[in-house]
A protein has these predicted regions:
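Flexible "cap/lid" loop of the alpha/beta hydrolase fold
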Residues: 134, 142-174
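Gly/Ala-rich beta-loop-alpha elbow adjacent to hydrolase catalytic centers
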Residues: 121, 125, 129
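An N-terminal hydrophobic leader/cap segment in hydrolases
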Residues: 1-31
Length: 289
């Protein structure tokens, strides 16, 4: 378990981030070939029908901090760090790719209450949600009841694995403080108003987790999640996409619109992170169904 996440429960600038970090459980999940004593972080908070929330690339569970207060009276929220991301353990000499991410989530589902589960995925987490729902409809029909995707990344296109050396250089570049600050600002519709020390702290906190660069490089080498949206899974799907999204460019948005059709709704005054820029609209969309 990352020391940074333990400290976050009391030391984060953002009070909503502190609440979420304090709700973390450390689960043992029997992933193939890994030490059974490893502990995997997942925040569990609220009461009601279970709802699983999946964060994006090079992020952590803490990105859902503003959405949690709006949903926790209606749902028991399960918010994991995806395998190889956030504050998860990162054993050496291991492949980090989509298959491991899905294996980890399938084991997590076995720990969740029985019955239908809702699923919200943001950015890359949207593609993870689609793949997980499609997988579960074959293994356990009805387990995933519906999906809400927030600016989903990777539904279209094709995998583009980075070769050795370039993957490590890319990870090192993403670790630079100035680069992280720039990406954090780029993710919001109005960074001058929305981004300050609290946002920058959470966007970079997990970089201190041991093995961060190695795992990120190996995930990039795998090609990650790309072109995974067709066919879409059977459960109902809604999609929110920020009108001011500057992370996913126009061609990606157009391809997603062709795939998703009327399921996709544009959100004004919103960048790449609807759950941070417009959490009330995200919660309203989910609770209205």
């Amino acid at each position: 378990m990352s020391d940074a996440l333990t400290r976050a429960a009391t030391q984060l600038i953002d009070p909503q981030g502190r609440v979420l970090a304090a709700a973390v459980r450390r689960l043992q999940l029997p992933l193939h070939g890994l030490d059974a004593d490893l502990r995997w972080p997942v925040a569990v908070i609220g009461s009601g029908q279970p709802l699983l929330l999946l964060h994006g690339f090079d992020s952590s569970m803490l990105e859902f901090r503003r959405l949690v207060p709006l949903l926790q009276d209606h749902h028991e929220l399960w918010i994991p760090d995806l395998f190889g991301f956030g504050f998860t353990p990162r054993p050496e000499a291991l492949d980090y790719g989509p298959q491991r991410v899905l294996e980890h989530l399938e084991l997590l589902l076995q720990q969740m209450p029985p019955g239908p589960i809702g699923l919200i995925g943001a950015s890359m987490g949207g593609s993870v949600a689609v793949v997980l729902a499609r997988h579960m409809q074959e293994k356990q029909p009805g387990r995933i009841s519906r999906l809400l995707l927030l600016a989903p990344a990777g539904l279209t296109g094709r995998p583009m694995p980075l070769p050795p050396l370039l993957d490590r250089l890319g990870a090192a570049f993403l670790g630079l403080p100035a680069v992280r600050r720039g990406l954090c600002r780029q993710a919001f519709a109005d960074p001058d108003a929305a981004v300050g020390p609290a946002e920058e702290e959470i966007a970079s906190l997990h970089v201190s987790t041991p093995g961060w660069g190695q795992a990120l490089a190996r995930f990039a080498r795998s090609g990650g999640f790309a072109g995974v949206g067709d066919p879409l899974p059977e459960p109902p799907i809604e999609v929110l996409w920020g009108a001011q999204d500057r992370i996913l460019r126009a061609p990606q948005k157009q391809a997603a619109q062709q795939l998703l059709g009327e399921r996709l709704v544009l959100v004004d005054d919103c960048g790449h992170l609807p759950h941070l820029d417009q959490p009330e609209q995200v919660a309203k969309t989910w609770l209205a169904a």
